């Protein structure tokens, strides 16, 4: 699927990316190649592949969720540049 120059410019504008004319031409070729590859992948017959299939054979890759050693409040705040009432104090993020 070949993308037009206008389509590449539109995508760049949506992404808020400024591209030169040379970059537009390069992106046009690269994005068209990617879309061609996706079209080729869509032709692969996956009718016999269960939706939940995976290839590693692993049943779980996560460790058990076990509570470990924790810092006390004093230890956690020991190196805080600013604290108040036992909590980290940071600059306001939102204006009120």
Swiss-Prot record:
Q: Which UniProt keywords apply?
A: ATP-binding, Ligase, Nucleotide-binding, Protein biosynthesis
EC number(s) given by UniProt? 6.3.5.-
GO BP term, example = translation
Catalytic function, reaction form: L-glutamyl-tRNA(Gln) + L-glutamine + ATP + H2O = L-glutaminyl-tRNA(Gln) + L-glutamate + ADP + phosphate + H(+); L-aspartyl-tRNA(Asn) + L-glutamine + ATP + H2O = L-asparaginyl-tRNA(Asn) + L-glutamate + ADP + phosphate + 2 H(+)
Q: Which family does it belong to?
A: Belongs to the GatC family.
Task: Give the quaternary structure.
Answer: Heterotrimer of A, B and C subunits.
Protein name as catalogued: Aspartyl/glutamyl-tRNA(Asn/Gln) amidotransferase subunit C
